[in-house]
C-alpha cells in the first residue's frame, strides 16, 4: 500500500485565502496518475471561474469557497464545499451555477441565506456611534460585510458586533483561541456604551 500525506494550515471559512488547503496538494499529486484529480485541481485551484465561482457584488464582496473534505465512498469521490456567497444571490442561484459548471453530480446540503442589514439602519448607526464614542474616534467608522456565520441571523434584525478590533490578533476557531485582558477591557467599555445607546434609543 502507498500512503500519501499532505500538511495544510487551517483558516476561518470566510477567509480560505489565509489557509493552506492540504486537499489541493493531494489533488495535484494524484493528478499525475488520475484524470479526475487533474480536473478537481483545475476547478478549485487554477480556474474556479470556469464553474462560476467568481461571483461578487458591491455590498458584500466576493464569493469565497473552501473544499473542506473529500472522501471515496463506494468508488465515488464525495467532496464537501463550504461557500459564502454575495447577498445579491440566493441558494437556488448558487446551486444552479454549480450544476451547470461542475462535471459531476451536485447535491445541496445545509444552506443559510446571507444576512445583510443596510449600513444606514438605526441599529447599525447606533452601534457605530457607541463604538466611536468608546474608542474616542473623531472620524465615523464604517461597518464591514464578511462571509462569517453569526447567531444574529436568529433575530428579525440583527448584526454581529465585535469582538475583533483593528490591529488585534484574532485566532478564531483555531488552536489556542484566546482573548487578551486588554482586549476584554476595551470590549467591556464598547458593549456598555452600545447597550446603553440601544436601551435609550428614541428614534
Predicted features by range, described:
Residues 10, 87, 167:
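Feature marks short, surface-exposed loop/turn motifs that line or immediately flank catalytic pockets
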Residues 15-22, 33-66, 71-74, 84, ...:
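An extended, acidic, His-containing surface patch that forms the Zn2+-binding/catalytic region
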Residues 1-20:
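Histidine/acidic-residue-rich, glycine-tolerant segments that coordinate divalent metal ions
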Residues 2-4, 65, 79-81:
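Hydrophobic residues positioned within well-ordered beta-strands of beta-sheet architectures
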Residues 77-89:
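C-terminal catalytic subdomain
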Residues 17-21, 28-33, 91-102:
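Short amphipathic alpha-helices in soluble, non-transmembrane regions
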Amino acid at each position: 500500500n502507498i500512503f500519501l500525506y499532505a500538511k495544510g494550515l487551517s483558516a476561518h471559512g470566510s477567509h480560505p485565502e489565509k489557509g493552506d488547503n492540504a486537499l489541493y496538494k493531494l489533488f495535484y499529486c494524484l493528478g499525475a496518475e488520475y484524470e479526475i484529480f487533474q480536473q478537481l485541481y483545475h476547478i478549485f485551484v487554477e480556474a474556479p471561474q470556469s464553474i462560476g465561482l467568481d461571483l461578487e457584488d458591491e455590498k458584500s464582496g466576493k464569493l469565497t469557497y473552501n473544499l473542506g473534505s473529500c472522501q471515496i465512498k463506494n468508488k465515488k469521490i464525495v467532496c464537501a464545499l463550504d461557500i459564502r456567497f454575495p447577498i445579491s444571490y440566493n441558494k437556488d442561484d448558487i446551486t444552479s451555477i454549480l450544476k451547470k459548471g461542475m462535471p459531476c453530480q451536485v447535491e445541496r446540503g445545509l444552506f443559510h441565506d446571507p444576512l445583510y442589514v443596510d449600513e444606514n439602519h438605526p441599529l447599525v448607526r447606533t452601534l457605530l456611534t457607541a463604538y466611536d464614542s468608546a474608542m474616542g474616534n473623531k472620524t465615523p467608522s464604517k461597518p464591514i460585510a464578511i462571509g462569517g456565520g453569526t447567531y444574529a441571523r436568529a433575530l428579525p434584525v440583527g448584526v454581529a458586533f465585535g469582538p475583533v478590533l483593528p490591529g488585534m490578533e484574532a485566532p478564531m476557531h483555531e488552536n489556542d483561541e484566546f482573548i487578551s485582558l486588554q482586549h476584554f477591557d476595551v470590549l467591556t467599555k464598547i458593549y456598555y456604551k452600545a447597550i446603553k445607546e440601544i436601551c435609550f434609543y428614541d428614534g
